[in-house]
């Protein structure tokens, strides 16, 4: 097994280009060896501008863009397509078109229609700037390329998603192309990967945990579907009262979804037939709906009206809403989630595509997978827990996930205190109300966060935790002295761990001297950091991206930390599929990205953000 830097090549297709350009870095270690690190990122570019996107009806709000007309190539995110044009005067007295004409660059704007809307962009430095859409080029991702040209996206698959054997072969070609460097006394690089031991690491493998579900049954990771046979570790402690919301004219689809959920959860039925592998009483659900409400598609006002109507009904535990496919910014998803979160009502969205699977008897086999995930989503959003870890290594009482959400220039929100006990059982999450300046979490908010952590643990166990592990996603370091004083005054041992997902390093594995992809659980580590594979690549293209796990302080052994991270990555509540991140930082990140959908200022065990 070896540390490894990425490598690739490129393809061109008319207006879209896919580049995989290697960059190199030389690092000289204490052993006087020079190590070549090759880092390659897939880069996509296009001749299309934001103006072309608007003309084709492609949504642009939220896209990352670069100013192609500027000397410094400013970059940022599209905030708004304005309701005024490039020919209308702005605050500084002239229009954007006049601005370029006065600069002597009329050739850039002379063919742009006066009706072209202005684009408002928040730059990466926080500035709020208005642009002509023709000046802006989107920063393309693989996902966007797929939407622009699905065929091209498939054709570049082999170049973008490569297994480790292919990656190393391409790197060897690249090293041979470098050859001997005459200016450095004919220095050349070896083509074999160096052993991790030369870099100060040891190699190992973390075995998957055993999970405990209903009836104290133990199941293996990869067989989570058995939870429907044995029941959940903890189901909601009441009979759920549900409200239903659906677009006008889709009552048949809504009925199909509702009947499937109700009969599956209460009777163990699937498509009106008793399933011998599904137990009765998975979740207790009230037979009659609290409210059934229609809404008109394409009318934001009607979305809010329907959501507010449900909001006024007392006692609803969860809303099941049928919504259009996709995440259109003008669709009902955001208004529904935001309004219901304000009054502490979780919701489970079901797409029309999924609903049609339940309506179509021929799709019954396909619909079962979706039903599993819908039921798990309802479970997690109403306080239930499908499974926990049987045995967690390390003498730890609870785990806490921290993250920071950026909402506007210079303003950050700590979305923290996702707290789990030593078995990975959710005790609750806490989203503070206060916004803060800068990425350094204010002392007052830290106090609030960890007070809530301690209160949640005490409420469950009747005593203060003795040992806490804090996971965070690499944001700026907080006041180390504060942690020392806070936990020291309470006699609590603490360990802080950074879990980083965006790294360029890879792992490779040798089987009979052949290079293959690393497997789930493969890792390398030293005293204070490790690289860990948390992704199962079976039947998938490409190679897994490991996590970088760094211990910042504390006494928990690095081998135990890696095992804890892997175990926590196997405990996602809302699906039988696994997440790459542990649920500590993974769920904290989800709160950040869905901040407006989550109640604030209170500890809660309902996973609104799933």
Which residues make up each language-model segment?
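Long, contiguous domain-sized segments
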Residues: 1-83, 276-278, 282, 291-316, ...
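Extended, highly charged clamp/arch subdomains and adjacent linkers
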Residues: 68-355, 603-610
């Amino acid at each position: 097994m070896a540390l490894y830097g990425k490598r690739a090549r490129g393809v061109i297709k008319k207006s879209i280009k896919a580049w995989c350009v290697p960059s190199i870095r030389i690092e000289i270690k204490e052993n006087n060896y020079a190590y070549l690190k090759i880092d390659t990122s897939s880069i996509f570019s296009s001749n299309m501008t934001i103006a072309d996107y608007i003309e084709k009806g492609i949504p642009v709000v939220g896209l990352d863009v670069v100013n192609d007309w500027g000397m410094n190539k400013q970059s940022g995110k599209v905030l708004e397509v304005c309701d005024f044009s490039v020919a209308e005067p702005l605050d500084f007295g002239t229009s954007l078109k006049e601005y370029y004409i006065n600069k002597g660059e009329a050739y850039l704007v002379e063919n742009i229609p006066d009706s072209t809307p202005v684009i408002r962009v928040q730059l990466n430095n926080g500035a709020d700037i208005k642009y002509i859409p023709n000046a802006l080029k989107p920063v393309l991702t693989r996902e966007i390329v797929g939407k622009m040209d699905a065929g091209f996206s498939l054709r570049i698959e082999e170049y973008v998603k490569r297994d480790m054997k292919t990656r190393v072969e391409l790197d060897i070609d690249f090293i041979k192309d470098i050859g001997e460097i005459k200016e450095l006394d004919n220095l050349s690089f070896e083509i074999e990967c160096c052993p991790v031991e030369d870099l100060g690491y040891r190699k190992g493998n973390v075995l998957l945990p055993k999970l405990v579900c209903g009836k104290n049954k133990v199941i293996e990771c990869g067989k989570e579907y058995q939870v429907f046979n044995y029941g959940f570790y903890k189901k909601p402690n009441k009979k759920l009262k549900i409200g239903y919301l659906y677009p006008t004219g889709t009552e048949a689809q809504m009925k199909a979804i509702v009947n499937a959920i109700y009969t599956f959860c209460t009777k163990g039925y699937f498509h009106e037939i008793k399933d011998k592998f599904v137990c009765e009483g998975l979740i207790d659900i009230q037979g009659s709906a609290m409210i059934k409400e229609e809404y008109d598609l394409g009318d934001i006002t009607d979305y809010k009206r329907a959501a507010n109507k449900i909001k006024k009904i007392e006692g609803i535990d969860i809303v099941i809403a049928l919504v259009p496919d996709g995440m259109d910014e003008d669709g009902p998803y955001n208004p529904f989630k935001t309004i219901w979160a304000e009054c502490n009502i979780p919701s489970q969205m079901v797409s029309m595509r999924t609903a049609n699977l339940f309506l179509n008897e021929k799709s019954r086999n396909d619909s079962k997978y979706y039903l599993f995930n819908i039921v798990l989503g309802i479970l997690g959003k109403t306080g239930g827990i499908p499974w926990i870890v049987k045995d967690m290594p390390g003498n730890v009482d609870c785990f806490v996930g921290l993250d920071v959400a950026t909402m506007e220039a210079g303003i950050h929100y700590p979305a923290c205190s996702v707290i789990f006990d030593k078995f990975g059982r959710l005790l609750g999450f806490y989203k503070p109300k206060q916004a803060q300046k800068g990425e350094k979490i204010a002392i007052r908010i830290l106090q609030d966060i960890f007070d809530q952590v301690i209160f949640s643990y005490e409420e469950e166990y009747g005593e203060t935790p003795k040992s806490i592990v804090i996971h965070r996603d690499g944001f700026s370091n907080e006041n180390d002295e504060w942690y020392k004083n806070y936990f020291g005054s309470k006699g609590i041992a603490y360990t802080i761990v950074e879990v980083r997902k965006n790294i360029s390093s890879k792992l490779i594995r040798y089987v009979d001297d052949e290079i293959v992809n690393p497997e789930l659980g493969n890792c390398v580590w030293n005293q204070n950091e490790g690289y860990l594979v948390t992704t199962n690549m079976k039947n998938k293209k490409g190679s897994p991206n490991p996590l970088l796990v760094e211990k910042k302080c504390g006494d928990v052994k690095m081998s135990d930390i890696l095992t804890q991270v892997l175990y926590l990555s196997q405990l996602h509540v809302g699906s039988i599929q696994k997440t790459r991140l542990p649920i500590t930082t993974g769920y904290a990140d989800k709160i950040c990205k869905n901040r407006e959908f989550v109640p604030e200022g209170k500890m809660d065990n309902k996973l609104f953000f799933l």
